[in-house]
């Protein structure tokens, strides 16, 4: 595995772009780390990322390139993809495959449009004043500059609509206000770090066997914060049921 991983990284370093082409218009597509919830659960119909790249490539306007960036944690967390995957993308004439270490902010800042299956990239795009297309059902899709697609057949019209779109920051601010009203304090980064340290040797292992006694110990150690999360979820369920009841009665 180590030899394979090093060979794949060598191919990435030697073949993936590490700079922007001056005055080149492009659509930005960040790849998801695989396997990942954003693909397998949120958008299973679109979990084949190579197919997504090819479908976008087919209908991209002639004066645009598609910049596809490898996920920076794909290698460290899950091993780099098979070299065949990268070669298939490199064959596409209107596609540039971007190195995982390249600064994503430069891509957000200079692109005309962001396309993402799911995840947070399309939400990030709004802070750079960029429109975006997504395939997953995500809460932030209520922002008008984010268009949800249900099939690849909607790509061409979606791209055309986004490229004509004028972004209004007030809608992003409204969404952030909604988030603030419906949020609660929970240090998820600290919780995930504790989880990784307990079960994955500080994130250095992937395929590990869980033991019941270790899980019980972990849950007991974090009982207070998990109880708080559970109460907030129950509160939200009650709120949703009240709203649904009122809508039904109307």
Where does each model-flagged region fall?
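C-terminal amphipathic helix plus adjacent low-complexity
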Residues: 12-14, 23-25, 152-250
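A donor-sugar binding/catalytic signature common to diverse glycosyltransferases
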Residues: 100-147
């Amino acid at each position: 595995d180590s030899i394979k991983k090093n060979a794949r990284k060598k191919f990435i370093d030697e073949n993936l772009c590490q700079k922007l082409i001056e005055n080149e218009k492009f659509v930005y597509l960040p790849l998801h780390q695989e396997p990942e919830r954003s693909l397998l659960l949120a958008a299973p119909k679109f979990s084949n990322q190579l197919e997504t790249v090819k479908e976008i490539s087919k209908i991209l306007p002639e004066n645009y390139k598609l910049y596809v960036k490898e996920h920076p944690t794909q290698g460290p967390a899950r091993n780099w993809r098979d070299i065949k995957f990268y070669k298939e993308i490199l064959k596409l004439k209107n596609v540039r495959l971007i190195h995982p270490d390249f600064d994503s902010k430069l891509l957000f800042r200079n692109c005309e449009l962001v396309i993402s299956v799911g995840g947070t990239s399309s939400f990030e795009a709004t802070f750079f004043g960029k429109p975006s297309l997504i395939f997953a059902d995500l809460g932030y899709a209520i922002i008008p500059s984010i268009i949800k697609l249900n099939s690849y057949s909607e790509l061409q019209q979606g791209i055309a609509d986004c490229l004509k779109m004028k972004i209004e920051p007030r809608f992003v601010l409204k969404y952030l206000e909604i988030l603030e009203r419906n949020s609660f304090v929970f240090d998820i980064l600290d919780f995930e770090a504790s989880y990784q340290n307990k079960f994955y040797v500080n994130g250095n292992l992937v395929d590990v066997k869980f033991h019941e006694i270790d899980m019980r110990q972990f849950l007991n150690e974090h009982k207070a914060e998990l109880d708080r999360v559970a109460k907030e979820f129950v509160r939200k369920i009650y709120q949703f049921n009240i709203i649904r009841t009122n809508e039904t009665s109307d």
